[in-house]
A protein has these predicted regions:
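Glycine-rich N-terminal segment of FAD-binding domains in flavoprotein oxidoreductases
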Residues: 36-37
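Active-site microenvironments in enzyme catalytic cores
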Residues: 4-33, 43, 49-188
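Short, surface-exposed charged micro-motifs
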Residues: 40
């Protein structure tokens, strides 16, 4: 079993029973503190965890990590390290915040931020992506927009995966305001 996912593990950080972020679910993300510091972090309960601060305090000792791996504005470099390293870091976070381990109060002040006092940011810089027509209904709807409903699905759609290049700039955070065009207008 993955140590971080042990269902019997409990955290010394108070976690509501209905929380999406118990000690068994250790996500990675990017947040900005009230002091405007951008941090690679994680979350347990209602607290954001500054992984760079943990790293500087030697909590990741024994895990092969560059000194500045968590001193970035995106997760891209950390993600390149691969699943074995992610798992080691998650296991260590679970160990650090386990009820069997205590953290010095001066470390808590540096490492933890209340989640309602931070702003979540885009976790990765997306360079490019390919999207696929994986849903028949989606492909049909798009086909109706570009062709007529009688010829919405092209014959090849049922036989090969149809992919298309997507614009990385179209990937945004939930809740971001979007300026929607009002359509084309003829010049006056």
């Amino acid at each position: 079993m993955i140590k971080a996912n042990d269902p019997n593990r409990k955290s010394w950080i108070e976690v509501a029973s209905h929380s999406d972020f118990p000690i068994q679910n250790i996500p990675f993300g990017i947040f900005k503190t009230s002091e405007k510091t951008i941090c690679i972090g994680s979350r347990i309960g209602n607290y954001a965890i500054d992984l760079n601060a943990l790293h500087k305090l030697n909590y990741f000792e024994g895990i092969t990590l560059n000194p500045d791996i968590f001193n970035k504005e995106t997760l891209n470099d950390f993600l390149k390290l691969g699943k074995p390293v992610w798992r080691q870091v998650r296991d260590r976070i679970a160990e650090i915040f386990d009820t069997n381990n205590a953290m010095d109060e001066s470390h808590k002040i540096v490492v933890l931020s209340k989640i309602n006092e931070v702003e979540m940011l885009m976790p990765v810089k997306v360079g490019d992506y390919t999207d696929f027509y994986s849903s028949r209904q989606h492909a049909y709807n798009v086909g109706c927009m570009f062709r007529d409903p009688n010829n919405a699905l092209l014959p090849n759609w049922l036989h090969i995966p149809v992919g298309y290049h997507g614009r990385a700039s179209s990937i945004i955070l939930s809740g971001t305001n979007i300026h929607r065009p009002k359509g084309q207008q003829l010049p006056p």
